[in-house]
């Protein structure tokens, strides 16, 4: 596995690039997670080309967001990372918030998203839901990603589960 830390790049994004070949698969994690969520999928996917996993701004080992976080900002982060790594086009897969970023990226840069996969990602949320997410982002920025775990467990594993 080849690991690169891109602190020297223009956008301060931490990433791992694994495998080789002409095709690239990019994996985007969800809110409060980091690139390591893909550690079990990366080896299998690397059989098909290079696999790029990275930490979103404010997550893992990446820099804090350069502006107020939003889908357009995260879309630009990915475009800048692809530019820095000379990746013209890729298959892009995102989980939860990562899926929302994939959709935004495909709208912003349609020629760069060869194929998209959206996993367990919400669509057309209400303003109240957006506000709740933004509060979780701020909580994770202030107190670290572990601060959102208890709330996530309550949401995901209800009594009915």
Where are these regions (language model features)?
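Alpha/beta-hydrolase
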Residues: 159-161
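Active-site loop/oxyanion-hole signature of alpha/beta-hydrolase fold enzymes
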Residues: 39-44, 52-94
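The serine-hydrolase catalytic nucleophile loop
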Residues: 30-42
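Flexible "cap/lid" loop of the alpha/beta hydrolase fold
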Residues: 100-108, 112-143, 147-150
């Amino acid at each position: 596995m080849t690991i690169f830390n891109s602190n020297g790049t223009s956008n301060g994004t931490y990433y791992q690039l694994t495998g080789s070949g002409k095709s690239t698969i990019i994996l985007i994690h969800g809110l409060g997670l980091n690139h390591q969520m893909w550690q079990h999928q990366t080896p299998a996917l690397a059989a098909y080309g290079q696999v790029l996993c990275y930490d979103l701004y404010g997550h893992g080992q990446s820099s804090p967001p350069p502006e107020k976080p939003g889908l357009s900002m995260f879309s630009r982060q990915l475009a800048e990372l692809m530019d820095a790594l000379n990746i013209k086009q890729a298959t892009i897969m995102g989980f939860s918030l990562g899926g929302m970023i994939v959709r935004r990226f495909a709208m912003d840069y349609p020629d760069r998203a060869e194929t998209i996969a959206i996993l367990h990602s919400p669509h057309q949320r209400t303003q109240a839901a957006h506000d709740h997410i933004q509060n979780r982002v701020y909580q994770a920025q202030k107190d670290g990603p572990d601060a959102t775990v208890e709330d996530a467990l309550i949401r995901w594993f209800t009594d009915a589960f």
